[in-house]
């Protein structure tokens, strides 16, 4: 398997849905087994997918996209977009008047360049049918309110503090942690740069979303320390009551080492917040 997940020299693909930028897809140099690339699932709006393409220095001649059954055995739709530019709209909802998003499907996108192709994969579903928008809105609200340490906005009633939560550290926070730890203690973090949102699962029961981003916090020596954060949500939207419930929450943060900053004081090495059990 050859993937170029972080290389800026390779084109990058993401999707827009209801104002959210979602699912930055890794690019593969070779076609993949469709049953082995299930890391993300992308909601479709009114039969259309809005694709954002960062070409960098590459010249993209055309884009092919193919919709398959989820097991990859049946090809349902195949289309081409010439000179797609930075944004493209993919029509994926209907074939000969028949709705092909009545169930989960697999999407393959191929970018054709001068001397090579790149392949991208995601599962796709009907976003409105599975209440994707209100679920994403809930995640965004919880995420932003936790960062801001906002009170009276439902965080305290959504979490389930118990002995399962480790309230001695901010490195790993869960739905079982207390309100103080879920809302970042005294760190007052500021998001640095963009956030990467990946929908890991979306079905009739729940949505699972993972956020990746960096934050700046004041460290032990009153300097700004930077941390890499992963924040996971599993939520359920109930159409009848129009309410969203938090089913699971898990957040980790690890300090990004900066050799230009002071790393020693009279107490020894300044470690910041890191995993107690690094791999």
Feature roles, as predicted:
Residues 200-215:
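A short hydrophobic beta-strand element
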Residues 70-73, 163-165, 171, 240-269:
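Surface-exposed loop/turn elements that mediate protein-protein interactions on large endomembrane-trafficking
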